[in-house]
C-alpha cells in the first residue's frame, strides 16, 4: 500500500481493476470476516444482493457525465466477474496518508445487478478504479485503457 500512497501523493496515475478497486475502499466484509482496505475511497465492500452470485458477464453502466476513463464509451457494455462491490462512496480522510485530493472532482459511475446498485468506476485525481475488467471488455475496454494511458 505504501507504493500506492507514494504514487497518489506524487500525482502519478494509479489504475485498480476488480479487486484492485475493492482494496482502495476503507474496509470490506467477505465470508463474515472484516478486512481493512487501503482507505483511499470512503466506504465498504459487501456481498452483492442478487439471486445469482457472482455477477458474471456483460453489462451496461451509468457513466459519470464527466468521466475521463469512460469518455467515448459511455453507452457500451463491459465484462464483470465479481461477488462483492461497494454500494456507496463516502468521504475518505486521506490526510492521514499526507494525500490531499480536495482540488480534484470525484467521478463515480454505477452499475446495477440484482437488488444492488454498485460503484463500477471511480476517478479522483490520479486514482482510477473499475469493478469491471477493461482487459476483457473488447473495444470499449481498449478505449478505456487508452483514455487512462493518456493521463500518464
What are these regions (language model features)?
Residues 1-57:
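Cysteine-nucleophile active-site neighborhood
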Residues 6-9, 43-152:
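Amide-donor transfer/coupling interface in amidating biosynthetic enzymes
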Amino acid at each position: 500500500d505504501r507504493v500506492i500512497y507514494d504514487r497518489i501523493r506524487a500525482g502519478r496515475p494509479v489504475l485498480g481493476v476488480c479487486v484492485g478497486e475493492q482494496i482502495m475502499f476503507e474496509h470490506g466484509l467477505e465470508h463474515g470476516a472484516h478486512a481493512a482496505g487501503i482507505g483511499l475511497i470512503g466506504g465498504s465492500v459487501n456481498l452483492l444482493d442478487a439471486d445469482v452470485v457472482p455477477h458474471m458477464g456483460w453489462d451496461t453502466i451509468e457513466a459519470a457525465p464527466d468521466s475521463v476513463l469512460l469518455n467515448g464509451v459511455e453507452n457500451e457494455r463491459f465484462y464483470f466477474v465479481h461477488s462483492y462491490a461497494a454500494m456507496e462512496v463516502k468521504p475518505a480522510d486521506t490526510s492521514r496518508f499526507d494525500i490531499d485530493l480536495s482540488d480534484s472532482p470525484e467521478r463515480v459511475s454505477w452499475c446495477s445487478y440484482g437488488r444492488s446498485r454498485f460503484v463500477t468506476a471511480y476517478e479522483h485525481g490520479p486514482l482510477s478504479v473499475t469493478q469491471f475488467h477493461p482487459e476483457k471488455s473488447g473495444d470499449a475496454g481498449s478505449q478505456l485503457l487508452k483514455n487512462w494511458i493518456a493521463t500518464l
